Amino acid sequence: MKKRTIAIKRILASVLTGVTVLSCMGCANTGSKLLDPKNPVTITIWNYYNGDQLTVFEKQIENFNNTVGIEKGIVAVTVSQGDIDTLADSLIDAVEGKAGAQEVPTLASVYSETAYILDQADTLTNLEPFFSEEELAAYVPGFLNEGRFNEENELLLFPIIKSTELFTANETDWEPFAADTGITLDSLVTKEDLTAAAKTYYEWTDAQTPEIAEDGKALYGRDSIANYIYIGCYQLGQDMFPVTNGKVTLNMNRDAFKVLWDNYYIPYINGYFGSYAKFRSEDAKTGKILALTSSSASAGYLPTAVTLADDSTHDISIFVEKDLPFADASINAVVQQGASYCLLKATPEQEAGAVEFLKWFAEPEQNMDFAMKSGYSPVTLEANTTDAIKNAYTGDLTTAEGQNIFNALSASADAFTNGVAYATKPFQGSKDLRTFLGEALEGRAAEDRAAVAAAIGAGATREEAVADFCTEEYFDTWFAELCNQAQALIE
């Protein structure tokens, strides 16, 4: 990292030699005064979009250039890097000045881990001075807070579109279960309610074939286990990785992790929860689960019909709600996901032009158009209302897929408006640690479920098969190992 930092700083020093970097001194209008329609400045914007999303973005760029760009003297040029990982690698190569690397862009869409690396190398511009307090107050607070991760609390990331996690369910096939048990979708208020419902569903489906022991079905699955851990601990009042003076410390609370364990690992090894295909929406399409937690941006992939193992197919409707909290949640927090834009250090004119573009693109008219056509949420409070979503939505509400996407966007708006949009702060090794924690819980659950299934196949009852895995001692051993390995990753 030190070599990388030195290399980047040397390159920036040579690029910016002779350029006077002007401070906005807290005035949001200073930057725009640097622009001259007679001497337009060119800004380069790196994105990772593809397909229809890229087409919509390129049309927005064209619209900007033909309006605000002409008026203020800004020419925006966008380059798609194909995917977010390629963009991150290419961006780091560019600022390091590697042979064959592209020129450093003015703006780039990145995750916070990449922004952290760039900030450590002193390559990012603080966006805060370009905005008035009134302007910043228009955005969902949590979206901006994600971009304030360094010691100076500078605003280094600017949001354009976001997503969250939603709880969805096949309400058509849920109805017979509800009729027999009284457990309706509306009765699920917490994750603990869901865990209890999944146990009942397993027993209910198992009882339908009394001649076959322990063939009950899983009710639920979720895509991101890392999100489950991070948002779960935060809801339960635990900041797992507090950062003080640039140094991260480990704060993994045993009680919080036991709640996570009891509401994912325990139901999973019992067969109440399940995961079979790559994504849980695929499991729902084949009837292997009825409910799932997944990204709001993937609502277009939610099933509109179920095809069973015998190739029979039936249409379904989907229940959509913001993800369920824990019963003891002390913070009404929801996951926020999605890359944001960072401003690379450039000339004062380029920086001013880039911020003008960001402000324009985040205005509800432009932002709603891009967000709705991308399946993501807009970033202002004004745009995150059901009425605003309904007025801007361009999908076909007469189709099940169109209705699913609309319901997901509406539920997301409610989640972001009435909850805390949460994202962890980046630090050295944060990406690897996130991957490790998610795989540690998910992998252990899958491994032990396989052992339980094998034991049942050999003649054990389910209660006998899971007994050794459900003890406090077993959890404590796993948790101690988890903490030790996590500590090693941040040292």
Question: Across the structure, where does each feature detected by a protein language model lie?
Answer:
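Extracytoplasmic/periplasmic substrate-recognition and gating elements
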Residues: 308-384
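Extracytoplasmic "Venus flytrap"/periplasmic binding protein-like
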Residues: 69-142, 177, 290-291, 308-311
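Glycine-centered hinge/linker elements that transmit conformational signals in sensory
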Residues: 195-202, 233, 243-277, 317-324
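Short, solvent-exposed loop/beta-turn-alpha elements that line the ligand-binding surface or hinge
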Residues: 128-139, 183-187, 213, 218-220, ...
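Extracytoplasmic/periplasmic solute-binding protein
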Residues: 150-160, 165, 192-249, 289
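Conserved C-terminal helix/tail region of periplasmic/extracytoplasmic solute-binding proteins
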Residues: 401, 407-491
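Hinge/lid segment of periplasmic solute-binding proteins
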Residues: 109-166, 175, 210, 315-323
